[in-house]
């Protein structure tokens, strides 16, 4: 039915403004004087008499703050001193004058209600009272003439636009090929259409008011808050949109006073290794004003304020605890949220916008947080907006105003006390016990709202209808009139701007420009950030130490590799290699800074928005803090590599060497920092860094000499800072030195009749000048050394300047609207055209519809509000009863035992819905994990039975577990995820057709038809929070759990309506025979009544109550009231009532020990009796039915082959639908191979040309590290899903998981090998090679890339994350390429390292490729490579060299008949050249076989490491196994080294002892 335009209901008053006006004037005279913020406060005598803008406050001054008490921190002397100074204000000259009314001090004491020396002013004392402290602080500031900014905000015609449509299509590997057939998308049209996020908003918020922002997820709440603060970042306001702060335009306000309006994002971003105290003291120091009360120092002032905020938000006990994050252990999630809150409070901003800041807090903590905000508004005059999804009535009543959003449209703005009446007068029904906030949000949900009788066809239905109704209402007219008065009171850009400037200027430090939004000067910012940088380093000192140790170890390895290099011409190549290594390792050690800068970018952006500091101040501080550390590391690193690597031991040359290497470190650090600052994402930065490193390495001058560079790429040499450093170091090393000729030609010549076969040699001289050698070989000159230093310093200054500039300019990231992603050709009809959302929801609900109202008894039907409008009768009824008795869970933390669960008993019957609740830290999730058999550590005792029998291996497969984290594979669709679960978790006896039909039933049950073909995606680009939660539930239902369904916080992060939908759906499942046990977070009263039974836990995992809830919670409430609790009010939420009486919240306490009461109660004894009865009844049934038909229940539902097929198909699918990964892989191989190929394009047959050809092969292997870094994150994504959800559910085996990931990588690696082969070898070697040799090269290329993938999986298999594995893989790769025989010939390796050349897999890859490419290639020496000399008088060149030729010399004489200027080339074929590196054509197939042996080893090692480290981790034996393996491998290594090197050393272990090793290993495995 078509929607009718809404009309105001005739005959009914819309507002109560007449009586409201009389209330507000009385109320404002009694309200506490507002001030600027919670710690620096200026009073005002203004009386706000606007009848619309101020509602009556039901709280007496200070009465509502009784619960805002704090946890006492340990006293610190300086804080005690500050508190004592504050308590002795009478000694301060500015506050001691005596007046007729008793003096200012007496006024302050009377107003604050404290006496001198009162401990309520000391945040280190338990008696500290924040409200009294704030009142005292206000008047001290007034007495000293300290002003603080305060302002309201008005917005008119606010319209915000974003890019993106409601629907996007999923890209696949072939999408780029199909793009030409979609020219509209190719040109960008239709790809990112403009979307209106906020439509024409109007409103005004006076200073000191609290605004509640209500709306369902996706309605625009976050965008609205960002718009108020001016932090749209990629979104756009329409030109007509007006936002001003008491007359100051948003543009001017954000430019000059940015930190005065701040936005608190829903996510927390902090430096994880800083402590809570360091984090908050930094925030306080960054906003410390220049003029401070009582003249205290900056440090004392900021420390005191940080302590105050920690005390207010219950963080005092965490002062020395790291903040932490998902990977670093620190404070809890709730405490981290409070750190974010305290940080904003310390910013002192007069306008604060909080985006769902109560998420993750229990109801008691959320209420205390809201009351603290009220203190800031009433006492400090702070204007605050809070978006909240689940708000209790107590929280709602604290707010002054509320705005309701519906699909980006404003449908109400006004005082909180009239909002409910407005919608009721519109025609909507509010059920009893539903909170006002829930009611206001519910009217925006077609499936939840209820129309009053007689108004079904008169109420608005769509968002546009609601907006139209609002704009026609009297409330909106009064709002617009009030906005006109607001604008008249604060004319644009007039007096208020000047006041703000004056107040801001008073707070600014010296040397800060008047229009700067910052309070402290740039030098102060840099100093503050530098101190913080060192605090971060100290907090993460283990990582810093590990990094430095790895660098030092690399220096030791490289130095020892070139140890004892001969000081002859044979050492020229080694000197070039060691200097190349030194400059390269010094220069590239800073590449890890890219990840570090991206990790801190969200924090820097946040702090810049808070006006803590300039982004370039943090960047400059990072540089300053790094220089001493880099200096020390460079000093140790270069001392080792210089003296161990055989370089000249001259003080002057060493210090020049160190100078250039250190400047190179700084220059490359500046380049990598600039790269990170100039890009938007880590993949962008790393991709550019990879290409840049390849270019820097090739065009350093070592791998490819300048004279052999082609013009199309030679320009890279001139912009390569490493090239200038390499030239300087090489000429510095050889300058002024002469090197004995190692290979004179002929060796028996005398006088002028011989020459050294080295570039730069002079005929007849037995030594070669180092200067002549570098000039002839590289065209280098010692005269360039200081020129190069100047060029390096120029690079350094340039990139530092660019880095600081882009750091300041490139902070924001583009924002776009949320959208669903579908596969092409699978767009639902509902998205192909418009639809009536009300009709889609089943029409308008009626208040007396029994399907809509909450059930009136525990067995009543919960109907249409559940996600599914269809029946759930397809759920098979269950008969099994799950019981647990005296369950105890103990773990050991830091050597101390700790009990998490303490003798908990209970049961879950089929057809019942049981709630698991408790205070924060009570162990709700821990109990759920223990019952579901998902714990991996500790000791669990007690009885857990199904029908009186112990749990078998199939228990986890037969239960469903809906985890709190909605973890899904982002590339799969909803239907595919459900089918995957059904395929693997339903028994093999069920046909695939039946499984898929059941999946369709699940989709209908959960009302997922509209997005069943949608791709899961990532937040913002895929399913929203509610849809993800439904999918999580659907995945478990698709498995058809035969026993029961566990759910952990299924409503977490959802709005109240979505929570209601989820719980009522669970109600329907229970009514149809499903057994359900669910933890629930902060349920509303009507939601709580959906449950049949409650298990309530106190801290320490102790039981407070287990039993029936009863109708209207009577059974539950009677228990608490009969045992001494205060009666529950008729309108009070029973769930919140329970939390309050047991002392939940940071400051909550209870006089009654409820776990002890429960233990001694009759109800507890009844539970034990009931458990006995259940066990007795089920035992009799078991005896009557005999043994179970399933004698040996299997761990998995499907056989191994079926598992492997399903999982491999899904992994293939994931790869195919991740084109960025596949194309990134292919483009890396293609671009790198083409770049290398055309850099070494068609090298000639000179000795240098052969060396360059060998280096081209070597350079191909260097992309190994980038390939490995690409593969590992993809593996981790699959592994996280498997280990967190699918392995505990026994969906498939860990062996299947590993094999599927190995198998899927291989085809892509084969294709990548073909691409690299064609792109590299044809440009480098041409097409003249035989087809056989081209085929061998192709086989080696394919093998190399398959080896890379299996190596990556071997490394990541047992390690926790890709970052850790990446570091290890890079180190191992460095060793492999170092010892492959290219950079140091095998015969020149020290004996200790020769075995490394043999065990390096790259040795055999390079050997096979080089032998195949250069076999039988004729050598034609370049002019500077020839040994040119005159033969004795009367002899020809052939006659003179006949003796040398007869001795089997490998060279070739070019002019045998000449009698002068004999030209002798030391080599005649490529095989001779390769022989020096022990590379032989005859070994090509042996090397190929060894390569496959390494691949097989990688696969077996992958399986073994994963099993030992991750599968058996719960047994506690992996560490013992690894220890045994490592110990005996070291012994075996000694034996193998002795065998390979041919030395007569024996393995220290006898053969019998090695046999014993295998026995020990087998015992551990068994």
Swiss-Prot record:
Disulfide bonds: none
ABC transporter domain span: 167-432, 882-1125
CDD domains in the record: ABCG_PDR_domain1, ABCG_PDR_domain2
Subcellular location field: Cell membrane
Record field: compositional bias (Basic and acidic residues): 1178-1193
Keyword Transport found: yes
Main localization category: membrane
PROSITE patterns, A to Z: ABC_TRANSPORTER_1 (PS00211), ABC_TRANSPORTER_2 (PS50893)
PANTHER family: ATP-BINDING CASSETTE TRANSPORTER
Protein name: ABC multidrug transporter MDR1
């Amino acid at each position: 039915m078509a929607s009718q335009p809404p009309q105001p209901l005739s005959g009914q008053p819309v507002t109560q403004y007449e009586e409201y006006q009389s209330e507000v004037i009385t109320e404002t005279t009694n309200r506490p004087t507002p001030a600027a913020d919670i710690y620096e406060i200026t009073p005002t005598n203004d009386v706000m008499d606007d009848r619309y803008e101020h509602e009556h406050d039901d709280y007496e001054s200070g009465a509502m703050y009784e619960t805002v008490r704090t946890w006492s921190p340990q006293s610190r002397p300086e804080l005690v001193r500050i508190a004592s100074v504050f308590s002795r204000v009478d000694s301060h000259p500015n506050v001691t004058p005596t007046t007729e009314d008793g003096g200012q001090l007496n006024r302050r004491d009377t107003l604050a209600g404290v006496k001198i020396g009162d401990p309520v002013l000391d945040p280190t004392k338990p008696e500290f009272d924040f409200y009294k402290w704030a009142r005292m602080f206000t008047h001290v500031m007034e007495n000293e003439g300290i002003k603080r900014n305060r302002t309201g905000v008005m917005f008119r015609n606010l319209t915000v636009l974003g890019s993106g449509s409601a629907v996007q299509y999923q890209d696949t590997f072939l999408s780029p090929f199909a793009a030409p057939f979609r020219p509209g998308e190719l040109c960008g049209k239709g790809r990112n259409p403009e979307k209106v996020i906020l439509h024409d908003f109007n409103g005004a918020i006076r200073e000191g008011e609290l605004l509640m922002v209500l709306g369902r997820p996706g309605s625009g709440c976050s965008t609205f808050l960002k718009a108020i603060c001016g932090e749209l970042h990629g979104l756009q306001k329409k030109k007509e949109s007006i936002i001003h702060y008491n007359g100051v335009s948003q543009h001017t306000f954000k430019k000059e006073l940015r930190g005065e309006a701040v936005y608190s994002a829903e996510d927390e971003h902090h430096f994880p290794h800083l402590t809570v105290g360091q984090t908050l003291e930094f925030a306080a120091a960054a906003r410390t004003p220049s003029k401070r009360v009582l003249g205290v120092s900056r440090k004392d002032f900021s420390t005191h304020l940080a302590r105050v905020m920690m005390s207010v938000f219950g963080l005092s006990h965490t002062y020395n605890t790291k903040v932490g994050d998902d990977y670093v252990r620190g404070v809890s999630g709730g405490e981290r949220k409070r750190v974010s809150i305290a940080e904003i409070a310390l910013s002192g901003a007069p306008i604060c916008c909080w985006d769902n800041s109560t998420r993750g807090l229990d109801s008691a903590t959320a209420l205390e947080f809201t009351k603290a905000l009220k203190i800031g508004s009433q006492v400090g005059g702070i204007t605050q907006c809070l978006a909240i999804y689940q708000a209790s009535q107590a929280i709602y009543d604290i707010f002054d105003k509320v705005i309701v959003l519906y699909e980006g449209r404003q449908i109400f703005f006004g005082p909180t006390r009239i909002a409910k009446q407005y919608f009721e007068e519109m025609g909507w029904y509010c059920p009893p016990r539903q909170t006002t906030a829930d009611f206001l949000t519910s009217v925006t949900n077609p499936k939840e709202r209820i129309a009053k009788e007689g108004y079904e066809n008169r109420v608005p239905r769509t968002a546009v209808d609601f907006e139209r109704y609002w704009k026609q209402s009297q409330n909106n007219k009064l709002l617009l009139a009030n906005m006109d008065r607001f604008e008249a009171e604060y004319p644009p850009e007039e007096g208020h701007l000047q006041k703000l400037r004056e107040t801001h200027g008073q707070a600014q430090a010296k040397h800060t420009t008047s229009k700067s939004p910052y309070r402290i000067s740039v030098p102060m910012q840099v100093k503050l950030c530098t101190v913080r940088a060192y605090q971060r380093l100290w907090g993460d000192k283990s990582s810093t130490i590990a990094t430095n140790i790895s660098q030092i170890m690399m220096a030791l390895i490289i130095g020892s590799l070139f140890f004892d290099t001969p000081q002859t011409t044979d050492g020229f190549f080694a000197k070039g290699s060691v200097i190349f290594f030194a400059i390269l390792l010094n220069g590239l050690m800073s590449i890890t800074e890219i990840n570090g800068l991206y990790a801190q970018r969200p924090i820097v952006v946040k702090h810049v928005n808070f006006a803590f500091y300039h982004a370039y101040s943090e960047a400059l501080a990072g540089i300053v803090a790094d220089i001493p550390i880099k200096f020390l590391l460079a000093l140790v690193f270069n001392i080792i590599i210089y003296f161990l690597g055989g370089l000249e031991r001259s003080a002057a040359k060493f210090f020049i060497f160190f100078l250039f290497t250190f400047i190179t470190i700084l220059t490359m650090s500046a380049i990598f920092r600039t790269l990170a600052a100039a890009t938007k994402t880590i993949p962008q930065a790393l991709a550019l860094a990879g290409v840049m490193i390849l270019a820097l390495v090739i065009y350093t001058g070592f791998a490819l000499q300048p004279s052999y560079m082609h013009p199309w790429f030679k320009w890279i040499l001139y912009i390569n800072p490493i090239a200038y450093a390499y030239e300087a170091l090489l000429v510095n090393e050889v300058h002024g030195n002469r090197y004995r000729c190692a290979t004179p030609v002929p060796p028996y010549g005398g006088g002028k009749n011989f020459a050294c076969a080295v570039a730069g040699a002079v005929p007849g001289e037995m030594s070669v000048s180092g200067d002549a050698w570098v000039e002839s070989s590289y065209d280098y000159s010692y005269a360039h050394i200081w020129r190069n230093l100047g060029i390096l310093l120029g690079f350094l200054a340039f990139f530092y300047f660019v880095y600081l500039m882009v750091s300041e300019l490139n902070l924001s990231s583009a924002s776009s609207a949320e959208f669903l992603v579908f596969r092409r050709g699978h767009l639902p009809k509902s998205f192909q055209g418009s639809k009536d959302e009300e009709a889609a929801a089943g029409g308008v609900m009626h208040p007396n519809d029994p399907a809509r109202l909450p059930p009136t008894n525990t067995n009543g039907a919960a109907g249409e509000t559940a996600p599914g409008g269809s029946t759930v009768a397809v759920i098979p009824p269950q008969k099994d009863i799950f019981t647990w008795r005296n369950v105890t869970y103990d773990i050991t933390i830091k050597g101390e035992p700790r009990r998490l669960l303490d003798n908990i008993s209970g049961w879950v019957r089929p057809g019942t819905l049981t709630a698991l609740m408790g205070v924060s830290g009570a162990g709700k999730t821990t109990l759920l994990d223990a019952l579901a058999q998902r714990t991996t550590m500790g000791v669990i005792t007690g009885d857990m039975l199904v029908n009186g029998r112990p749990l078998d291996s199939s228990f986890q497969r037969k239960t469903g577990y809906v985890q709190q984290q909605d973890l899904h594979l982002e590339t799969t669709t909803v239907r595919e995820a459900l089918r995957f679960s059904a395929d693997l978790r339903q028994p093999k006896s069920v046909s695939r057709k039946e499984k898929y039909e059941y999946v369709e039933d699940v989709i209908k049950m959960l009302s997922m038809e509209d997005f069943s073909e949608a791709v899961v995606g990532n937040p913002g680009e895929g399913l929203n929070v509610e849809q993800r939660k439904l999918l999580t539930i659907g995945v478990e239902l698709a498995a058809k759990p035969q026993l029961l369904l566990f759910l952990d916080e299924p409503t977490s992060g959802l709005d109240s309506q979505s929570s209601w939908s989820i719980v009522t759906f669970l109600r329907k499942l229970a009514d149809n025979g499903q057994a359900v046990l669910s933890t629930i977070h902060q349920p509303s009263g009507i939601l709580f009544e959906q449950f049949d039974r409650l298990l309530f836990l106190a801290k320490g995992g102790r039981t407070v109550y287990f039993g029936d809830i009863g109708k209207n919670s009577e059974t539950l409430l009677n228990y608490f009231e009969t045992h001494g609790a205060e009666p529950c009010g008729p309108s009070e939420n029973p769930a919140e009532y329970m939390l309050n009486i047991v002392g939940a919240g940071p400051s909550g306490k209870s006089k009654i020990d409820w776990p002890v009461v429960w233990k001694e109660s009759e109800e507890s004894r009844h539970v034990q009796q009931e458990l006995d009865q259940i066990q007795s009844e089920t035992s009799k049934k078991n005896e009557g039915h005999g043994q179970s038909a399933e004698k040996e229940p299997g761990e998995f539902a499907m056989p191994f082959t079926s598992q492997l097929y399903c999982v491999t198909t899904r992994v293939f699918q994931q790869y195919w639908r991740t084109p960025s990964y596949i194309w990134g892989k292919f483009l890396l191989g293609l671009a790198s191979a083409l770049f290398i190929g055309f850099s070494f394009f068609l090298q000639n047959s000179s000795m240098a040309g052969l060396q360059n050809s060998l280096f081209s092969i070597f350079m191909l292997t260097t992309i190994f590290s980038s390939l490995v870094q690409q593969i590992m994150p993809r593996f981790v994504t699959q592994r996280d899903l498997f280990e967190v959800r699918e392995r505990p559910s026994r969906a498939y085996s860990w062996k299947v998981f590993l094999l599927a990931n190995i198998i899927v990588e291989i085809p892509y690696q084969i294709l990548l090998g073909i691409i690299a082969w064609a792109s590299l070898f044809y440009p480098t070697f041409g097409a003249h090679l035989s087809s056989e040799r081209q085929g061998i090269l192709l086989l080696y290329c394919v093998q190399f890339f398959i080896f890379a993938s299996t190596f990556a999986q071997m490394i990541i298999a047992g390690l926790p994350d890709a970052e850790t594995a990446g570091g290890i893989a890079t180190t191992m790769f460095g060793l492999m390429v170092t010892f492959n025989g290219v950079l140091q010939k095998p015969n020149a390796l020290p004996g200790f390292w020769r075995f490394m050349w043999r065990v390096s897999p790259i040795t055999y890859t390079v050997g096979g490729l080089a032998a195949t490419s250069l076999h039988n290639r004729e050598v034609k020496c370049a002019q500077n490579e020839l040994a040119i000399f005159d033969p004795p008088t009367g002899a020809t060149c052939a006659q003179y060299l006949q003796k040398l030729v007869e001795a089997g010399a490998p060279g070739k004489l070019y002019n045998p008949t000449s009698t002068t200027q004999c030209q002798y080339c030391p080599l005649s074929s490529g095989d001779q050249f390769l022989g020096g590196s022990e590379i032989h054509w005859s070994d090509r197939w042996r090397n190929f076989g060894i390569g496959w042996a390494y691949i097989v080893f990688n696969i077996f090692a992958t399986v073994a490491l994963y099993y030992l480290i991750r599968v058996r981790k719960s047994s506690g034996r992996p560490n013992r196994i690894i220890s045994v393996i490592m110990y005996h491998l070291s012994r075996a290594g000694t034996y193998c080294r002795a065998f390979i090197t041919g030395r007569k050393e024996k393995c220290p272990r006898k053969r019998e002892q090695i046999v014993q090793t295998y026995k020990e290993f087998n015992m551990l495995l068994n």
